[in-house]
């Protein structure tokens, strides 16, 4: 791909190297929040433009620049260009030329768009069990949450459109706001920071300009010459190459063939793509507490059955996340036909909160618009064990696996491996994979720690009041299948939201999600 010629009115800043790895460049994402009342479209629109004037990187274009380590640059508009883009956005009749699209759908109830969200708006979801509902119609969802967004990196690199766009839709009984973005924008903490800045702008004034734009938090981990790309060798009082992180394998030819066959047979024969849909689950707080009590009882029983030496070595701490993920994995695996087949689950850890070895705190920029999320595998289990082990025992398995993964040396190995093999500008061509080729595969992102449910946009209500979201939505554009991908959104509207992609058979399996209340 040829380099992009200079664009007048923009300042080029390199995309950070970790954000330019293929797991980020290949994904275009959107996140929506739904509030249980009408908010002012005018206030939402004007405050968005005010925020962009304070943080012009939100209006950045992305272009190919071979001179940067990542191969990509943000082209950040200068003040006069920001004004020009705002004027175009406000007056254009083309959604692709608008930085924020506002939709007055006040003639429609949100129930016509997403029934399970409508139940949340009405506070009528069950307090006794989990509720399950299908995602909105895809065409309607695009129209109502991201009609101005680019849908691929290829399009983004050519389009005169920002890599982050906003959307606001008012229904007769609710308001949905959304951000659509290339995943090079960062992680869930990055998106939360933008929503929070938008909220702050409505309530009082735009935040101060971002400091440290252009600082690359992981450039020192870039092989082969980055000062942190090697690990300390205490035996030889020197340095050595960083190996693969826990649970990752470098595939040879035979493994590649086996993996390709397993994926193709699943996609083309066993579970064709047309059978998949996106589903949402809402777990009320009462159910969360019941699961926590059940898991603690399971752990107590495990301790009681252990001998004295095992008891001393057994760390029985489990978190709410451990239990929620254990519950989700039990239900996901219930429909798997081969119970003895091993299963590997990838989940997320974050270098923002779990820094890698050799990390210097001054390397991290003071703003949040960069990513630190890393995908790591849990220790494999047989599919039948995931489906049938006691909840607390499975939660312990998750916690133990993640404890090993967040070791600083392993975090360093994750970052160095990603930069060595999957950088968009220079992939190695080697296949580094998180599971054996014959395993069941699934992945789950965790967003609970970002606390999206605390965002209060009540300053845009009439009269102003406290208005927090009661439902959250997401989707993504990706070149490969979305199957087996899940997210634990976190607490909102008096419960915890989940979403993922599965077949109708899996969504209604009698030993899995079929046990719960399905919302039509």
From Swiss-Prot:
EC class of the enzyme, as a word: transferase
Induction: Expression is induced when cells are grown in cultures containing vegetable oil as the carbon source.
Enzyme Commission number, as recorded: 2.3.1.-
KW Oxidoreductase (keyword) present: no
GO molecular function: acyltransferase activity
Keywords, in A-Z order: Acyltransferase, Transferase
Presence of keyword Acyltransferase: yes
Pathway recorded for this protein: Secondary metabolite biosynthesis
Coiled-coil residue windows: none
Annotated catalytic residues: 183, 456
UniProt biotechnology annotation: MELs not only have high potential as eco-friendly biosurfactants due to their excellent surface activity, but also have attracted considerable recent interest because of thei runique properties, including self-assembly, anti-tumor and cell differentiation induction activities, and moisturizing and hair-repairing properties.
Family: Belongs to the plant acyltransferase family.
Role: Acyl-CoA-dependent acyltransferase; part of the gene cluster that mediates the biosynthesis of mannosylerythritol lipids (MELs), surface-active substances that enhance the availability of water-insoluble substrates.
Name used for this protein in its record: Acetyltransferase MAT1
Gene assigned in the entry: MAT1
């Amino acid at each position: 791909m040829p380099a992009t010629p200079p664009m007048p009115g923009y300042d080029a800043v390199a995309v950070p190297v970790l954000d330019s790895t293929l797991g980020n460049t290949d994904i275009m994402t959107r996140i929506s929040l739904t509030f249980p009342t009408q908010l002012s479209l005018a206030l939402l629109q004007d405050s968005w433009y005010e925020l962009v004037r304070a943080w012009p990187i939100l209006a950045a274009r992305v272009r190919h620049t071979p001179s940067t380590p990542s191969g990509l640059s943000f082209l950040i508009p200068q003040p006069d260009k920001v004004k020009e883009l705002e004027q175009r956005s406000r007056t254009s009749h083309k959604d692709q030329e608008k930085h924020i699209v506002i939709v007055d759908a006040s003639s429609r109830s949100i129930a016509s768009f997403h029934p399970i969200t409508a139940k949340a708006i009405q506070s009528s979801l069950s307090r006794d069990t989990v509720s399950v509902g299908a995602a909105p119609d895809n065409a309607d969802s695009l129209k109502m949450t991201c009609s101005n967004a680019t849908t691929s990196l290829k399009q983004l690199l050519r389009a005169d459109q920002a890599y982050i766009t906003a959307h606001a839709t008012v229904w007769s009984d609710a308001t949905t706001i959304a951000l659509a973005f290339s995943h090079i924008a960062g992680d869930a903490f990055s998106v939360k920071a933008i929503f929070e800045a938008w909220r702050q702008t409505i309530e009082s004034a735009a935040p101060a300009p971002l400091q440290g734009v252009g600082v690359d938090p992981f450039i020192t981990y870039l092989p082969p010459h980055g000062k942190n790309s090697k690990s300390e060798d205490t035996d030889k009082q020197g340095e050595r190459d960083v190996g693969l992180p826990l649970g990752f394998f470098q595939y040879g030819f035979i493994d590649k063939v086996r993996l390709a066959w397993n994926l193709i047979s699943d996609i083309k024969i066993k579970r064709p793509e047309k059978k998949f849909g996106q589903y949402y689950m809402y777990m009320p707080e009462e159910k969360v507490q019941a699961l926590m009590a059940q898991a603690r009882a399971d752990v107590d029983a495990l301790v009681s059955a252990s001998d004295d030496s095992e008891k001393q070595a057994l760390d029985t701490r489990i978190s709410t996340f451990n239990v929620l993920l254990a519950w989700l994995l039990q239900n996901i695996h219930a429909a798997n036909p081969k119970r003895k087949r091993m299963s590997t689950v990838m989940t997320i850890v974050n270098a923002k909160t779990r820094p890698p070895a050799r990390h210097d705190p001054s390397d991290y920029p003071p703003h949040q618009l960069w990513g630190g999320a890393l995908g790591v595998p849990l220790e494999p289990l047989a599919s039948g064990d995931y489906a049938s082990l006691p909840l607390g025992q499975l939660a312990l398995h998750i916690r133990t696996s993640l404890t090993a993964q967040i070791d600083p040396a392993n975090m360093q190995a994750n970052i160095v491996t990603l930069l060595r093999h999957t950088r968009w500008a220079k992939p190695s061509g080697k296949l580094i994979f998180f599971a054996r080729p014959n395993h069941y595969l699934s992945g789950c992102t965790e967003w609970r720690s970002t606390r999206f449910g605390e965002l209060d946009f009540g300053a845009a209500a009439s009269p102003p009041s406290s208005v927090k979201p009661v439902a959250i939505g997401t989707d993504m554009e990706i070149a490969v299948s979305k199957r087996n991908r899940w997210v634990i959104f976190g607490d909102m509207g008096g419960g915890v939201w989940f979403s993922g992609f599965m077949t109708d058979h899996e969504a209604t399996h009698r030993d899995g999600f079929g046990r719960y209340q399905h919302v039509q």
